[in-house]
């Protein structure tokens, strides 16, 4: 059975997307790119650009499920808030199209794709290229989104992945 996964790396200015097909244990590249918003635009306009852009990706590539990177808290509270709003817009766009959504932290993505949680972005990009047999390196935000999609492909086949699609987590063998 084939699955098509849309991975999203949310950003307040650039939101990356990556689409892969999963057939058995094979992962195949479908598409990737970025949705860009204008930095000086009002928040409502930027949210609309994100929702419309994600809907266009969904309508074009018809994914069966989606994965989204979780927001990290950084030293700048305003930047964290903006990133959270962009992420909320992405989540809204996905659920409005009735896609099941799983969430992964940056640490989980790096561990899944590279094997260690403190891997630099360049190493993540390198592994995305290798895992999907790409001829070139995608733009950074698109590569991150492909890494999120690959992480979901790696985690979603078993029981834990099915729980993640329902928004549930397992830690230390316990449902949290």
Swiss-Prot record:
Pfam families: RuvC. Its EC number is 3.1.21.10. GO terms for biological process: DNA recombination; DNA repair. One of its GO terms (cellular component) is cytoplasm. It is found in: Cytoplasm. Gene3D superfamilies: Ribonuclease H-like superfamily/Ribonuclease H. Keywords: Cytoplasm, DNA damage, DNA recombination, DNA repair, DNA-binding, Endonuclease, Hydrolase, Magnesium, Metal-binding, Nuclease. It catalyses: Endonucleolytic cleavage at a junction such as a reciprocal single-stranded crossover between two homologous DNA duplexes (Holliday junction). It comes from the Bacteria. Binds 2 Mg(2+) ion per subunit. Mg(2+) 1 binds at residues 9, 141. The RuvA-RuvB-RuvC complex processes Holliday junction (HJ) DNA during genetic recombination and DNA repair. Endonuclease that resolves HJ intermediates. Cleaves cruciform DNA by making single-stranded nicks across the HJ at symmetrical positions within the homologous arms, yielding a 5'-phosphate and a 3'-hydroxyl group; requires a central core of homology in the junction. The consensus cleavage sequence is 5'-(A/T)TT(C/G)-3'. Cleavage occurs on the 3'-side of the TT dinucleotide at the point of strand exchange. Homodimer which binds Holliday junction (HJ) DNA. The HJ becomes 2-fold symmetrical on binding to RuvC with unstacked arms; it has a different conformation from HJ DNA in complex with RuvA. In the full resolvosome a probable DNA-RuvA(4)-RuvB(12)-RuvC(2) complex forms which resolves the HJ. This is Crossover junction endodeoxyribonuclease RuvC.
């Amino acid at each position: 059975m084939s699955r098509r996964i849309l991975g999203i790396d949310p950003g307040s200015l650039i939101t990356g997307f990556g689409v892969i097909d999963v057939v058995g244990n094979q992962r195949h590249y479908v598409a990737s790119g970025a949705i860009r918003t204008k930095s000086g635009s009002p928040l409502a306009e930027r949210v609309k650009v994100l929702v419309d852009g994600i809907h266009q990706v969904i309508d074009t590539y018809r994914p069966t499920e989606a994965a989204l990177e979780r927001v990290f808290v950084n030293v700048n509270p305003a930047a964290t808030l903006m990133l959270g709003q962009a992420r909320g817009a992405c989540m809204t766009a996905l659920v409005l199209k009735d896609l099941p959504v799983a969430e992964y932290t940056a640490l989980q993505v790096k561990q899944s794709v590279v094997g260690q949680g403190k891997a630099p972005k360049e190493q993540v990009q390198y592994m995305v290229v290798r895992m999907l047999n790409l001829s070139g390196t995608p733009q950074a935000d698109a590569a991150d989104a492909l890494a999120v999609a690959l992480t979901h492909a790696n985690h979603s086949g078993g029981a834990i992945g099915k729980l993640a699609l329902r928004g549930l987590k397992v830690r230390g063998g316990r449902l949290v």
